[in-house]
Amino acid sequence: MAFFCFIVLTYFIGAIPSGVWIGKAFKGVDVRDYGSKNSGATNSYRVLGAKLGVAVLIMDVLKGFIPLYIASKFNLVYNDLVILGLVAILAHTFSCFISFKGGKGVATSLGVFLFLIPVITLILLAIFILVAYFTKYVSLASITAAFLLPIFTFFTHKDSYLFALSVIIAVFVIYRHKTNISRLLSGTENKFKF
């Protein structure tokens, strides 16, 4: 019963559409009407500016981290936390607050894995930053980090649930970037201005 309650709590926290709500509250705009029309942190940064974009990023990361942190205080087993991590990421991507649509799951995945495997996640974050900085493609950085996640997890952790989550999220995030991949291959992907 307690685990079910945490699934519900995690979903509603993860489903908070940070970019949409912050955009409407502070700028009177819906970020889904501009740029890539995505509600995630990258498009929010482009549409709303650096300060609000960073705020969206932080909120999206916390949506993955906070539910797991709270649940861990109630003696849930590690595998339950892994499942809650998946719920948080799916909630962000399929938010009940915006017609079951949402971002691509990268920032919320960062929050989830920062809690579950902080050292590996920080290494992947460093790789993400380097790829994004030198190529100016956030999408390529996201795809690279997602691809490396299950590889790093396999060699550093023996938990089957965690490895399964890393594979699912890697495939999911890369799939969510399918239009970005097409634009990268055609040379039409938008570069990110830092």
UniProtKB/Swiss-Prot annotation:
The chain crosses the membrane at residues 2-22, 52-72, 80-100, 112-132, 137-157, 161-181. GO terms for biological process: phospholipid biosynthetic process. It is an enzyme of class 2 (transferase). It is found in: Cell inner membrane. InterPro entries: G3P_acylTferase_PlsY. Catalyzes the transfer of an acyl group from acyl-phosphate (acyl-PO(4)) to glycerol-3-phosphate (G3P) to form lysophosphatidic acid (LPA). This enzyme utilizes acyl-phosphate as fatty acyl donor, but not acyl-CoA or acyl-ACP. Probably interacts with PlsX. This is Glycerol-3-phosphate acyltransferase.
